Amino acid sequence: MKGLQLLATGGALPGRVVTNEDLSRQVDTSDEWITTRTGIRQRYYCTESEDAATLAIAAARQALARSGLAASEIACCVAATLSAPTATPSVACRVQAALGLPENRPAFDVNAACSGFIYAIAAAHGLLNTLGGRYALVIGCEALSRMVDPTDRTTCVLFGDGAGAAILELAEDVPFAVTLGARGSEAIRVGGPAACDTAPITMDGKAVFRFA
């Protein structure tokens, strides 16, 4: 089976910078406490006009431009995120629309938290090998600032927002191996909001019927 090699990357950060000093004014912490335990001095938060999808689009656009490829050459788009602005449409579909990627190619999200980008790479590798195509767009994007309790110093000091994107090329004689796993028994130790409870589903049924 062919392997993947990195052709180009892109990145995007939102507009609001939050320093350790900023956090020390809202929770019992300090720059020294955070830096010595995490190495983090500042993180970036989305402004009102930004979210995981807008960051993903910016990062993907930069990666595509750096690759020198045309949008039509991208065979699949996989985005890893647990903080998409909507359950549907996916971030990957928003990227597909914004960049003009072909509509007859797969585009979808995966949610595997911190390991999500690795899962997305593995998914892209499988798609290229089974469906054909040479290039994949893989994205990792989060807007965790909107999910974190700003009064909980065990989480608010760690998480921020941003996106990274990679154009990967399927190639002969390229070493490639991924080991994936999960420990669902520890799920009680990490939790997030019930996104499906926040808003009802909306759909223009007639319009969907016409293009489906």
Question: Which residues are covered by each model-predicted region?
Answer:
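Flexible, glycine-rich active-site loops centered on histidine and acidic residues
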Residues: N129-A163
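Conserved beta-strand elements of the Class I
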Residues: Q5, A75-V78, L137, F176
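Condensing-enzyme catalytic core mediating Claisen C-C bond formation in acyl metabolism
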Residues: M1-E48, D152-A212
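Acidic-glycine-rich active-site phosphate/pyrophosphate-binding loop
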Residues: V27-T36, T86-L101, V138-L144, P193-P200
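Acidic, glycine-rich active-site loops and adjacent beta-strand->loop/helix elements
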Residues: A12, A80-P85, A112-F117, G140-S145, ...
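Phosphate/pyrophosphate-binding loops at sites that engage ATP/ADP/AMP, CoA/4′-phosphopantetheine
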Residues: A59-A75
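Buried hydrophobic positions in well-ordered alpha/beta secondary-structure cores of metabolic enzymes
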Residues: L6-A8, I34, A63, C77, ...
